[in-house]
């Protein structure tokens, strides 16, 4: 076989189709928090259609539902829940206070 013809041969690997993220019975609604929370990042941002693997219509409905939930304060606009903990290096010790006086 020629090299030029060999490049166009397809490999016969098995292809597993992914399940759709939204089933036919799921209702896209601002009250359905379990469904909506799957399409929001850790920072509270709406994930893109490419990441979600949604259709255009589904992405539009998800976006509207997320925005409605934010307005009704069911979802936060930003998710900045950082735990600020003092480490030993940042805490002041009594010996440091005594020296400054």
From Swiss-Prot:
A biological-process GO annotation: translation
Domain of life where this protein originates: Eukaryota
Keyword Chloroplast: yes
Key words of the record: Chloroplast, Plastid, Ribonucleoprotein, Ribosomal protein, RNA-binding, rRNA-binding
Alphabetized InterPro entries for the sequence: Ribosomal_bS18, Ribosomal_bS18_CS, Ribosomal_bS18_sf
Any one GO molecular function term: rRNA binding
Location of the protein in the cell: Plastid, Chloroplast
GO cellular component: chloroplast; ribonucleoprotein complex; ribosome
Quaternary structure and partners: Part of the 30S ribosomal subunit.
PANTHER family assigned to the protein according to its UniProt record, in alphabetical order: 30S RIBOSOMAL PROTEIN S18, SMALL RIBOSOMAL SUBUNIT PROTEIN BS18M
Family assignment from sequence similarity: Belongs to the bacterial ribosomal protein bS18 family.
NCBIfam families according to UniProt: S18
Name of the protein: Small ribosomal subunit protein bS18c
Lineage: Eukaryota, Viridiplantae, Streptophyta, Embryophyta, Tracheophyta
């Amino acid at each position: 076989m020629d090299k030029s013809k060999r490049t166009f041969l397809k490999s016969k690997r098995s292809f597993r189709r992914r399940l759709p993220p939204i089933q036919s019975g799921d209702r896209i609604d601002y009250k359905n928090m379990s469904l909506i929370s799957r399409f929001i990042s850790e920072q509270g941002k709406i994930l893109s259609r490419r990441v979600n693997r949604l259709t255009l219509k589904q992405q539009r409905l998800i976006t509207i539902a997320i925005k409605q939930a934010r307005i009704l304060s069911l979802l936060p606009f930003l998710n900045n829940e950082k735990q600020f903990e003092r480490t030993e290096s940042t805490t002041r010790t009594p010996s440091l206070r005594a020296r400054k006086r």
